[in-house]
Amino acid sequence: MWLIVGLGNPGERYARTRHNIGFRSVETLAERHGLTFRNQRAKSEIAEGIIRGQRVALVKPQTYMNLSGQAVAALRQWYKIDPARELLVIYDDLDLPFAKLRLRERGSAGTHNGMRSIVGQLGTTEFPRLRIGIGQPPGQMDAADYVLSRFTPEEEAVLPEVLARVADAVEVVVSEGLTAAMNRYNPL
């Protein structure tokens, strides 16, 4: 069983923002595999099903970004998963250029408050993550304002391709393993 968590903020106000690229990623996966999100448990929308022969739960925590760990910790208990082997968190990263993907087995939360919450609630940094580059804020723009801003029209035009690559990478993670996915998608 894989718990695939896309980070974001609930509500229409945040739907198309940079910070919600994690939500859009799991939505792309759900659409590709004919899965439907429902409010089911642990303050999360969940779409359960099979991807490449593996049971998955695609998750959009509805706790707001800074409290994502509450939902992830509750779902870890519900599904009885081992985070090091059965959890993948997908989220935005300011430190990567726009559209760049980076898979890792583990790591610090960095400056990402959603990841800080998850690490704090799980009590470990030992779980896989897929970071999606959103680039740096322009000029003197505050990072908090930037992540809550929408993508430019030029970036939005490229996002379907980026989200398709994210979905492809997740499919490889669940079917062939994290190392295979890292070898295939990190160099791009």
UniProtKB/Swiss-Prot annotation:
SUPFAM superfamilies, sorted: Peptidyl-tRNA hydrolase-like
Primary site of residence: cytoplasm
Enzyme type, top EC level: hydrolase
Binding site for tRNA: Y14, Y64, N66, N113
Site (Stabilizes the basic form of H active site to accept a proton): D92
E.C. number(s) listed in UniProt: 3.1.1.29
Catalytic activity, reaction form: an N-acyl-L-alpha-aminoacyl-tRNA + H2O = an N-acyl-L-amino acid + a tRNA + H(+)
Molecular functions (GO terms): peptidyl-tRNA hydrolase activity; tRNA binding
Subunit structure: Monomer.
NCBIfam families referenced in this protein's UniProt entry, alphabetically: pth
Protein name: Peptidyl-tRNA hydrolase
